Amino acid sequence: EERENVLLLSSMHKEDRNMIISQLIGYLKQNVSIQIIWASHEPNNQENKYLSNIFKRNELSVSIVDSLSKVESVNSRVIIINTVGILADLYWKVKLAYVGGGFSSGVHNLMEPAIAGVPTIFGPNYKKFKEAVEILNEGAGKTIKEGSGFKETLINYFNDGKNLVKSSRSAVKIINSHIGATKKIINHIAIY
């Protein structure tokens, strides 16, 4: 099924939020067809309220939801997730993801969005993560060094469908190569 123009901001740390929020709001104001889903690394009422106020002050409608079914039933421009355990499902509903942690402790799981064929954007703290390097090398995602690169990267993906499709295919290719390698290992083990 055709996915909507939705950006998932997943495993968000405060450092990610602080780095990209103004760029994100600027982009959303200029591109009214884009919706976002925001999933904090550790969802809590204080952070949800803080985020909600920022978006509402910028005249963006906000819903805070605690289940996958509610994500599908609201029409707000901004959906804030107030639960854990549904990220893997959310990736199948979006065209692009920003994966948090890259401005603090290290970027989070990049294979989950790749499995869903979703290109990723992440911060500069990724070098100790082999899959992040692979995603960049294969063109399945981009890294930003600071917030100013975020809006430009969103424009590059959402406003040029070819880039999005190409990166999405690269993400799927990475997963397929991992599956192929796993099969070879299992077959090799089975011989012994």
PLM ranges: what are they?
Residues E1-Y192:
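Nucleotide-activated sugar donor-binding and catalytic core shared by glycosyltransferases
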